[in-house]
């Protein structure tokens, strides 16, 4: 079977099966070969790789990954796409389709049972309405993932890749960059999909580090500190950290002084390193209470 990454090839498959796109599932199929190639290049897929794909659609990206990788497991929630995928992937015995909701899948078990225990790469054109939960599931759970290369809404990619002091920098930037080095792989304007979405897209690469870059003593306190600091962006740290719920203003002032952080600064100006120092001091303070 030829590549599916063209408007005509995709339309032919859709018409053959009388497939109806679901807005609620965020179904927009990629129809540009150049972007497919950039995704493959950004994911650095090699012969021995095990790949997890979420939302394979009609198998456009799945096919191209299956030609290179050791094994591709595609997780698709829409049962109406299963017979289509069975057809479009029929000549690739190293691809497998799982008809489940990714957010309900035990990824650790899936990797163990179907992908030899890993390591794995997540490569996908993600449904935009659940992009962040999917990415964070792979980063926060004990999954042997080395790379996440995904098509996401442009605004989400900008936030994941943002640096301190910019309008896009926030809790998501820190949550992703705490685990990964990030890069923008490609831009994908809305006309590269059918049906055409209302937003432009970006392929972002998240390369998971072998070792933790930041010296964080208590991750729970760290992420709570980050969340509180961005709770109300216009508030200074002296005021926003009150959102933690267990520190009074005098204690916050003392902690900021010890961290060598001006109490008038706002959360969006702090680097991850500064948040690490700040949360470690908060953790020490809480532990000694």
UniProtKB/Swiss-Prot annotation:
Q: Where does S-adenosyl-L-methionine bind?
A: 28, 30, 55, 76, 101, 125
The entry's function note states: Specifically dimethylates two adjacent adenosines (A1518 and A1519) in the loop of a conserved hairpin near the 3'-end of 16S rRNA in the 30S particle. May play a critical role in biogenesis of 30S subunits.
Q: Which HAMAP family match?
A: 16SrRNA_methyltr_A
Supply the enzyme class, top level: transferase
What protein family is recorded? Belongs to the class I-like SAM-binding methyltransferase superfamily. rRNA adenine N(6)-methyltransferase family. RsmA subfamily.
Which Pfam families does the record associate with it? RrnaAD
EC number per UniProt: 2.1.1.182
**What are the UniProt keywords, alphabetically?**
Cytoplasm, Methyltransferase, RNA-binding, rRNA processing, S-adenosyl-L-methionine, Transferase
InterPro entries the record matches: KsgA/Erm, rRNA_Ade_diMease-like_C, rRNA_Ade_Mease_Trfase_CS, rRNA_Ade_methylase_Trfase_N, rRNA_adenine_dimethylase, SAM-dependent_MTases_sf
In Swiss-Prot or TrEMBL terms, this protein is called: Ribosomal RNA small subunit methyltransferase A
Q: Name its cellular compartments.
A: Cytoplasm
